[in-house]
UniProtKB/Swiss-Prot annotation:
Transmembrane segments: none annotated. The lineage of its organism: Bacteria, Pseudomonadati, Thermodesulfobacteriota, Desulfuromonadia, Desulfuromonadales. It catalyses: 3'-dephospho-CoA + ATP = 2'-(5''-triphospho-alpha-D-ribosyl)-3'-dephospho-CoA + adenine. This is Probable 2-(5''-triphosphoribosyl)-3'-dephosphocoenzyme-A synthase. Belongs to the CitG/MdcB family. One of its GO terms (molecular function) is ATP binding. One of its GO terms (biological process) is prosthetic group biosynthetic process. PANTHER family: 2-(5''-TRIPHOSPHORIBOSYL)-3'-DEPHOSPHOCOENZYME-A SYNTHASE, TRIPHOSPHORIBOSYL-DEPHOSPHO-COA SYNTHASE. It comes from Malonomonas rubra. InterPro entries: CitG.
C-alpha cells in the first residue's frame, strides 16, 4: 500500500481480476475512504450489540467473528478509496455515477468472499459505503467541508429510481437467482437498503445522526454513543436481516422493544439498561441479528466523521 499523500494509479490497488481503470487516487480520496472504513471498524468493535458480532461475542452467528470482520474490512478498503475518487472525477448527471461505483465494488465483493472463505460479513455494508463514498467524493470537488444533509441529497440523486428498476416483480421474476433482499421484497414489499438509499437514508438522517450527536453532547463514551445510535436505528428500520430470520412479527417486536429502551432513557440510566438487557436477550433467544441496522450504524458513524470530522469524547 502506498503512502496516503501520494497520487497513485488505480491499477496499483485494484484486484488482479478487475478491469483496467484509467484514473488516479489523490489524498482527499484516501482520507474519505479511510473515514468510511473507520465507520465499519467502529461498528463491529462496539460491544454488547444484540445478536450481532462484537468483541466479546459472535452474537447469533456461528460462521463469523470479530476476526472475520477485520479481514473483510481491510479487503474492501481500496474500493472505498476508488469509489471516492470516482465521485471526485465525475462530471455527468448523478444517476450515472451509480453504475461506476458499483462496477468498482463488484470485484471487491468477490475479494471479500474469497478472504472470508465464503462468509458474508459486509456485502451490504460495501454496497452502501461505496455509494456514500461516491457521494462524498462528488461533494468534495467543490470543498472537502460539506454539510451532512448535502451528502444524503447526493445519495438520493445517485440512486433515484433504484427500487423501481431493480425490485420490480417483472424484473425479479426473470432472474435465475435472487438475493435475500429481493426475495423479501417479493414476499413483503420491504425495499430494504435500496429504499433507504433512494430516499436519502432517512433512518440515518432523521434518527441515527441526531442520536449520535445527542450522545456525544451528553458526554457519552464512543461505545455508549454507538450503542444508543444502534438502538435508535432498530426502533425505526425495517431490517431485512430480522425479517429473514424471524418474520414480520419479530421485526415488529424488536422495534417496539427498542422504542421502550429509548423511552426509559436508553442506556444512560438503570431503567433503560434493564429494558436493553430484555431486548438483547429477546434477540439472542430467537436468533435475531439486526444486521441491516448495524450496516446503517457504520454509515452513520462515517457520515458523522465526514461532516463533524472528530468525536467529542476520548477515543477509547
Amino acid at each position: 500500500m502506498v503512502a496516503r499523500g501520494n497520487v497513485v494509479s488505480i491499477g496499483q490497488i485494484a484486484p488482479k481480476h478487475s478491469s483496467e481503470v484509467s484514473f488516479s487516487v489523490d489524498p482527499v480520496s484516501w482520507e474519505i475512504g479511510s473515514l468510511l472504513q473507520r465507520g465499519m471498524l467502529l461498528e463491529v468493535a462496539t460491544s454488547n450489540k444484540p445478536g450481532l458480532v462484537c468483541p466479546q461475542s459472535n452474537g447469533c452467528h456461528e460462521d463469523m467473528s470479530l476476526m472475520t470482520f477485520m479481514v473483510s474490512s481491510s479487503v474492501i478498503f481500496p474500493a472505498l478509496v476508488m469509489c471516492t475518487q470516482a465521485g471526485r472525477d465525475h462530471e455527468g448527471d448523478l444517476p450515472l455515477l451509480l453504475p461506476v461505483v458499483r462496477g468498482i465494488g463488484a470485484p471487491y465483493e468477490k475479494e471479500l468472499f474469497a478472504a472470508t472463505k465464503g462468509v458474508n460479513t459486509q456485502k451490504g455494508a460495501l454496497f452502501s459505503a461505496a455509494i456514500l463514498a461516491g457521494a462524498a467524493g462528488y461533494l468534495s470537488q467543490k470543498s472537502r467541508h460539506f454539510q451532512i444533509g448535502e451528502l444524503f441529497e447526493v445519495v438520493a440523486a445517485m440512486t433515484k429510481g433504484i427500487v423501481r428498476r431493480e425490485l420490480n416483480p417483472s424484473v425479479l421474476e426473470k432472474k435465475e437467482s435472487l438475493s435475500n433482499g429481493e426475495k423479501l421484497y417479493l414476499r413483503h414489499q420491504v425495499p430494504g437498503i435500496r429504499g433507504e438509499l433512494e430516499r436519502g437514508l432517512p433512518s440515518v438522517r432523521d434518527y441515527a445522526v441526531p442520536a449520535l450527536k445527542y450522545a456525544q453532547d451528553l458526554g457519552a463514551s464512543l461505545e455508549a454513543s454507538f450503542l444508543h445510535t444502534l438502538i435508535t436505528l432498530m426502533s425505526q428500520v425495517d431490517d431485512t436481516n430480522i425479517i429473514s430470520r424471524g418474520g414480520l412479527e419479530s421485526l415488529k417486536k424488536v422495534k417496539t422493544l427498542s422504542k421502550e429502551v429509548l423511552k426509559e432513557g436508553s442506556i444512560f440510566n438503570k431503567e433503560g439498561i434493564d429494558n436493553y438487557f430484555y431486548l438483547e436477550n429477546f434477540c439472542i433467544d430467537r436468533g435475531l441479528s439486526p444486521g441491516g441496522s448495524a450496516d446503517l450504524l457504520a454509515i452513520t458513524i462515517s457520515a458523522y466523521l465526514l461532516s463533524e470530522e472528530k468525536f467529542k469524547c476520548k477515543i477509547m
